[in-house]
Amino acid sequence: MKDLGAEHLAGHEGVQLLGLLNVYLEQEERFQPREKGLSLIEATPENDNTLCPGLRNAKVEDLRSLANFFGSCTETFVLAVNILDRFLALMKVKPKHLSCIGVCSFLLAARIVEEDCNIPSTHDVIRISQCKCTASDIKRMEKIISEKLHYELEATTALNFLHLYHTIILCHTSERKEILSLDKLEAQLKACNCRLIFSKAKPSVLALCLLNLEVETLKSVELLEILLLVKKHSKINDTEFFYWRELVSKCLAEYSSPECCKPDLKKLVWIVSRRTAQNLHNSYYSVPELPTIPEGGCFDESESEDSCEDMSCGEESLSSSPPSDQECTFFFNFKVAQTLCFPS
């Protein structure tokens, strides 16, 4: 095993990695949600007028669904949760405003992390999230969030530490690089993000706990020794480490149970109007009589435009206000709706 000492790593990639780790360690406290504010939310009983842990956790799951729907990366989701929690820990928020705040957190994070071509429009996010607010509402709330967080939105999160720890391990191990799955670790981090309690953990500690538990399952002495050196360099004391590792272990045990709705596997639910539901229902059982497409034939652009218009008409209800009592709504599993709308 290679030594993690800076002397041995002089002139190598390891020096830069440890330097970056020092920067992250200096920054992490500044971007953590106020513990006092999080504790107030934790102590709040569930009712209709006050923000409680259950509402916060449900909103984070909504953010995960939005990130999955728009194909956003894990960094966008984790940063959105960080922005959301930092704001909730500062302000006394009413439950009716939580949807708007959640959407704004997602949009702010996406603009920081994603490429321009992958940033969803405000209109699309409003429609898909069904947050019942306008583009003007989103703009005003984004301004409020940015001001309250002093425009420091690009935070150092547990995901930054997770990626850096993972890179440091691979830089110093002789074992196969694919043995430690970063995708699996990211999925586990997202599971922790869905619980308010882990927003109180230091990002460096949370990331190290996830890696430690995964390395233990691999039963790799070499990887464990590297982690111990990283822990020592990060100045993480045993009491803090073992406390959070126990909580993470319990969370992941529940996450892997059959009863748990896993963040990456939870099915999206789509609410559609009666007219759209009727169209989907009919198309499922009917066999469309389409003309045979000749080989080498030209694609008719006018037909494509007509079909797009038909689809947009059917989806008008997604961006409108909630249906009245006389209007029936149907719940469709997203995978089913996707199959019906986009046949292979």
UniProtKB/Swiss-Prot annotation:
Induction: Activated by actinomycin-D induced DNA damage. GO terms for biological process: cell division; G1/S transition of mitotic cell cycle; regulation of cell cycle. It is found in: Cytoplasm. One of its GO terms (molecular function) is cyclin-dependent protein serine/threonine kinase regulator activity. CDD domains: CYCLIN_CCNG2. Pfam families: Cyclin_N. Residues 301-313 have a biased composition (Acidic residues). Keywords: Cell cycle, Cell division, Cyclin, Cytoplasm, Mitosis. Its main location: cytoplasm. One of its GO terms (cellular component) is cyclin-dependent protein kinase holoenzyme complex. SUPFAM superfamilies: Cyclin-like. InterPro entries: Cyclin (IPR039361), Cyclin-like_dom (IPR013763), Cyclin-like_sf (IPR036915), Cyclin_N (IPR006671). Residues 301-320 are annotated as: Disordered. Transmembrane segments: none annotated. It comes from the Eukaryota. The keyword Cell cycle applies. High levels in cerebellum, thymus, spleen and prostate. Low levels in skeletal muscle. May play a role in growth regulation and in negative regulation of cell cycle progression. Belongs to the cyclin family. Cyclin G subfamily. This is Cyclin-G2. It comes from Homo sapiens (Human).
